[in-house]
Each structure stands twice: as structure tokens, then as C-alpha cells.
Amino acid sequence: MIYLVSHNKSLFQTDKYVEATMKQAMSVLLPLKLCQLDTETKGLDCHTKALLTIQLGNKDNQVVIDWTTLTPKEKQIVKNYLESDRLFLGWNLMFDLTFLYVQGIYPKHIWDGMIAEQLLYLGYPAQMREKSLKAAAWNYLNINIDKTVRGKIVNDGLTTEVVIYAAGDVTYIEDIKEKQDIEVEKQGMKLAVELECEFVKSLAYFKYCGVHLDVTKWKAKMAKDQAKLNKAISELNAWVVA
């Protein structure tokens, strides 16, 4: 079942999901030791684009939280949940974590299915095995996840269609993990997956903080690099013609 926590009453003119208070949502989420996590945003840059929703749940129940309408008290409840000792399962969590860091939310324990998939197929040609959630759902579960709605979020924001789509992204990850875990054990990669997933938090924080860059010096470097490239191309062309 899909639950939506939102103070935007226009989103509840449907029977595709049910309205839930934060208390009701927590009654669904608190028993979970493994919880799937995803977000929807208005763009890719965590510092200039808004966090729209946080999705939490499992294959039986999904809770979509409309972050844009929450009260400070409700946001604190979500923060406390995400910073608990639960293991949060996601896909390409570096992206989601940067948006959570902007909100002052720092999950402790995460597992990233995309990282596990990359490790399992490390060294294979990229085209042999796609690493997206859509591809994993098909490869492991024979389930087709429709991603067409994702392109509408930037312009449309949170709509009934987006709520349903968002819930779908926290439905299948646990089942995929169970399948991946079998292969991870076969290849003796359990520690490697744990280490790489732990590093995702640091990488996300690095991305969130950014890097100080001297623009003037960097442009000067670019000019030198371009000059070297032009010279190399000129010399190569002269050699070929000769």
C-alpha cells in the first residue's frame, strides 16, 4: 500500500494511495530493520534544486513524504528515523545523500545496490550489464519499472503520477538485494561491498562540500592544455601528410 504524508490536500483526489499523518507513517516504518530509501528532486544540484520527496518502505508498504510541506517538527521526526541504526537500502545513494546532507540529515548505515552491481560485474563491458535500478529489476526479478514519469518531475513537481512513481522506487530493492547477496557470497565479496557502500557516504559528503577552485588559475591551465593539444594535432597532421 502507498501512503502519502503531505499537507497539500489537492494531492488526495485519488484512490491510488492513502493520506497518512506522520504518526501513522511512523507506525508503518518503525518496525522495519531494513528500509528502502529514495528521493525525488527538482534537479541534479543539491544546492540549487529543491528536495521534493523522501520515499521509505518495503515491498508491502511505501511511504512517500512530501518534504516541501512538512512542519519543522515533522522534519525532525524524519531526520531521527533516517539517522537511526536501521540499514537503508537504495540505488545510487550518493545522489540522494547530498540532498539529505543539505537538510542536515546524515544516515549512518546504507547499502547501495548500484555499487554491489558494479562490483559484481567489474571488468565486464559496460554494455553487457546495465547498472540502473530498472535494469536490475528486470535482470533479477523480471519486473519492468516504468521510468517515463521521471522526466516530468523537473517541470511538474509533485503530482499524483509522481507520488505513484516515487513509491515504485522503494518497492523492489530489498528483493534485488537478496538476489545480489547470493552472487556476492559466491564471489567472496561481502566485505568489499560493505566497504564500498561505507565509502559512498564520504563520497557524497565530498560532493556536497565541493572543492575550492581558483577560476583564474584553472582557466590559465585550460589555455595551456589547449595550446598543447593544438600543437600535437598540428604535428600529427603534418606527419600523416608527409
Predicted regions and their residues:
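Short secondary-structure junctions
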Residues: L87, N144-D146
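Glycine-rich, acidic and aromatic/proline-enriched surface loops and short helix-turn segments
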Residues: W138-I143
